[in-house]
Every structure is written in C-alpha cells, then in structure tokens.
Amino acid sequence: SISGGTDVVGCLVLGNIFSKVYAGEIQGESLGIDVDIFDENGKKVSKNKKGELVIKKPFPTMPIKFWNDPKNKKFKNAYFTKYKNIWHHGDFIQKTKNGGFIIYGRSDATLNPGGVRIGTAEIYRQVEKINFIRESLVVGQEKEGDVKILLFVVMNNKNKLSDSDIN
C-alpha cells in the first residue's frame, strides 16, 4: 500500500522491508519526507488520533510552482493556505501504535446538496461513532441539477442493518 500523488510524483507513505506488515496499515514514511499529522488548529496529534497529513519541510519531489501561475497564487492556495508554510496534502491519516499509517480518505472532499456545502469528513466523523459499522463510503450523486448524498456501509461481523439502527 502507498499514499502520495501525481502532484508529488511519488509516495509520502509506503511499505518498507524493515517494518512488520499489519492489516490495513501502510508501514512508514518515504525517505526525505517529513510527514506529520496535524489537527484543525495546526497542532501535532498523538498516535492513534486522526488528523491532516502534512509535510513540514521541503522534499525532493515537491513541486515549486504550477505552469501558467506566475505569482504562485494557485500553487499556494492548493497546498499552503491551511497551515502557514506547511504542505497540506488534503488526506485524513492516523499513525498507529505499530508505527504504521492508516489513510482515511480526502479531508477536502466537498459535496453541495441543495447549495449547502458539506465535507465528506463531517459525515465520516459521525459514522465512525456508530459501533456496528466497520467501514463506510460517502459519495455525491448528481441528479436533476442537485447532489444526492449516498452512504454505503459495511457492517461489523454478523450485524445486519435494521430500521431501528437507521432511526
């Protein structure tokens, strides 16, 4: 497993031959990349807490600008507006007690049903509090000029979704 992007032409976290493999985890940081995890206030989070994937120092494959962006406005808006002088990648991530990483998806995914903007992260935050759901996926379905929010869930073990669970 890996996490990175075409914008960085590589991986930010990836597997390695020196660390144990745990189900659902990515083993470690890429060489030369100062990966960290911040909360919404720009403070480092402790292990086993989810937060924003950030890179605190310039790294070998970091783009230096965007094409046709002479004043670097688009470039700065893409990566450096959430935290001052810190690369904000736009992914939710957690460092586990094993030293590995779990990626939870985009932190900047926004849906717009009925003209009301809502980030998928807000929905995931609530769904994660429900103990009978193991995994979930939120998507927007465009229909007749609007967006319908769809939530797909995988139940824990042998649980079945019932009307009382929904209500």
Each language-model region and where it sits:
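Conserved AMP-binding/adenylate-forming
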Residues: 1-2, 6-100, 107-110
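AMP-binding/adenylate-forming catalytic core of the ANL superfamily
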Residues: 59, 85, 90-167
